Amino acid sequence: MTKKVYVKTFGCQMNEYDSDKMVDVLNAAEGLEKTDTPEDADIILFNTCSVREKAQEKVFSDLGRVRELKEAKPGLLIGVGGCVASQEGASIVSRAPYVDLVFGPQTLHRLPQMIDARRESGRAQVDISFPEIEKFDHLPPARVEGPSAFVSIMEGCSKYCSYCVVPYTRGDEVSRPLDDVLTEVAGLADQGVREVTLLGQNVNAYRGALAAGSSEIADFATLIEYVADIPGIERIRYTTSHPKEFTQRLIDTYAKVPKLVNHLHLPVQHGSDRILMAMKRGYTVLEYKSVIRKLRAIRPDLSLSTDMIVGFPGETEDDFDKMMALVHEMSYDTSFSFIYSPRPGTPAANLHDDTPRDVKLKRLQHLQATIEENVARISQSMVGKVERILVEGPSRKDPNELAGRTENNRVVNFPAPLASHPRLIGQMIDVKINHAYPHSLRGELVLVSDDASAATH
């Protein structure tokens, strides 16, 4: 009987990428297949996030739930990876003695060896070291599950924002060699991937050697240009970027590379210079707006999303008003916004915080309501227009229909003959938008040339 692995992922796209790699590593080494049901698994892995306290505590809550599974199946192995593993290390085993494996983002490729050591010794294995970027040299070729894929181009972050734990859990910035990234993207394209999302904690800081051991360095703009030249790749996204390193060369890439989508996620974190300084972000609101102004001079319809932290220590009503003014001016399409969560070991954790929790919550609700109004307005403005979408697969709402994604990252559901589904999935097609809903759009095929052939055969 085929053994199975269950992976639960918390947090960012970097973790989603890492989770896929965990499955690939275990499949190549031990023939394990992925399962969506922990009860069916022989190995259960939690890929964790420590950006906020709530996410961190949820991991231990989930661990408590799978403890019963281990009692019923003694051979079951339980592992904790990701940023909580890096931060907590062996203390995870002290708190949850039934955990067998603790590993960091940079050591997931060692999972097969850790599993062997656990079985031989009977003791929990902990490896949260930072071995540069060696994991990419030990990962098997990616297995594709659709026309879009994540590709990690670097690890870590060297910005050390005062509130952020990432540099301590993922290490400083280390870039993959250019040819290594291009080889992975080309391999994905050969398997039918049409859209890649280039991943890093701060992709703007990418400085990859042209090849392993080379002294010549490629910046992020160069990487994008090379990826765009790979046959089969029709769309390029990236996340996350940092305003401080948004160079003119990267801005110019939006004019040079049509395959770079008309959507940008650029975290601002706050709209007050005073708070940005306390966060150690390294830029002012004016400098942030200058980047957007230059980008929209090239791409007037550029869709913009961001991250925002409400209730940072010392935030006044005036600071929050400045944040809201920026939200209105930038017309953000989406925002990942949260109340500030102090993380142990970060400088901001020691700052005095005298803002009541209910005030923070009220501010967050106001911010999110405003963003939702923006989302609804932008979605409604797309009704009646023809959008180019990448067809990703059957619609979640109705498997008899198909779903795809626009450049500004909206899901579009549309009817298509069942017989045409295999031909259309993975294709770029035109869809006329007829209706806008809170979290999706609905449209109809605009049949031209190959699209018409695909839809009728």
Swiss-Prot record:
Belongs to the methylthiotransferase family. MiaB subfamily. Its main location: cytoplasm. This is tRNA-2-methylthio-N(6)-dimethylallyladenosine synthase. PANTHER family: CDK5 REGULATORY SUBUNIT-ASSOCIATED PROTEIN 1 (PTHR43020), MITOCHONDRIAL TRNA METHYLTHIOTRANSFERASE CDK5RAP1 (PTHR43020:SF2). CDD domains: Radical_SAM. Its EC number is 2.8.4.3. GO terms for molecular function: 4 iron, 4 sulfur cluster binding; metal ion binding; N6-isopentenyladenosine methylthiotransferase activity. Gene3D superfamilies: Methylthiotransferase, N-terminal domain, tm_1862 like domain. Its cofactor is [4Fe-4S] cluster. The gene is miaB. It comes from the Bacteria. Residues 3-120 form the MTTase N-terminal domain. Binds 2 [4Fe-4S] clusters. One cluster is coordinated with 3 cysteines and an exchangeable S-adenosyl-L-methionine. Residues 380-447 form the TRAM domain. Keywords: 4Fe-4S, Cytoplasm, Iron, Iron-sulfur, Metal-binding, S-adenosyl-L-methionine, Transferase, tRNA processing. It is an enzyme of class 2 (transferase).
